């Protein structure tokens, strides 16, 4: 779904420049995650193999997006989540048709279990970030921005696993080589920064 690219008068005055927001809350399931999930499920369906279900791990937005994409493709969806996950987000995933499996005390353990079950049962695992088709799907946001704006000086992108940053920045750098790309990572979940410092995916 194409989302609004909205000028912010308040923030533009605050920095004495022009600030725009890409309103991905308007996207299917309420976040940009639907872009990658839909692209991934679409490519699975076009692979020539008979796909009847997918597996993923998530605490919220990605799980809802995968469940939505799976429902559109009329296939089953199993999501692994850790204990103590938000009941509201769990309910949201269920509403989109996901079967919820609670495992482990954190996202790392839930993801490891999901990958284990995926491999054992030969069911495709849909990664939230470490997948070319997910990244390419997220990159459609960059293509939309290009069609909605004149050349930008800079773009600020939130970073979790890095899928949105990788996809969007790759596209925008290809059409606007001089654009400055800035990633923002939450201080209480700076896994991308730690991974970059370690030189490997943590």
Where are these regions (language model features)?
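PLP-dependent amino-acid enzyme catalytic core
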Residues: 1-202
């Amino acid at each position: 779904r194409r989302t609004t690219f909205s000028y912010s008068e308040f923030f533009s005055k605050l920095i004495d420049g022009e600030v725009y927001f890409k309103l991905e809350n308007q996207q299917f399931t309420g976040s940009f995650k639907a872009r990658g999930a839909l692209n991934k499920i679409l490519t699975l369906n076009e692979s020539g193999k008979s796909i009847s279900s997918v597996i993923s791990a998530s605490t919220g937005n990605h799980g809802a997006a995968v469940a939505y994409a799976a429902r559109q493709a009329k296939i089953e969806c199993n999501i692994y989540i850790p204990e103590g996950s938000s009941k509201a987000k769990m309910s949201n995933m269920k509403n989109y048709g996901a079967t919820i499996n609670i495992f482990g005390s954190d996202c790392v353990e839930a993801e490891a279990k999901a990958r284990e079950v995926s491999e054992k049962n030969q069911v495709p695992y849909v990664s939230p970030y470490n997948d070319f088709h997910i990244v390419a799907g997220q990159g459609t946001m960059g293509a939309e921005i290009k069609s909605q704006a004149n050349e930008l000086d800079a773009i600020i992108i939130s970073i979790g696993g890095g899928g949105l940053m990788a996809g969007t920045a790759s596209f925008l750098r290809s059409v606007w080589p001089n654009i400055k790309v800035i990633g923002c990572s939450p201080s209480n979940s700076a896994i991308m920064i730690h991974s970059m410092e370690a030189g490997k995916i943590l």
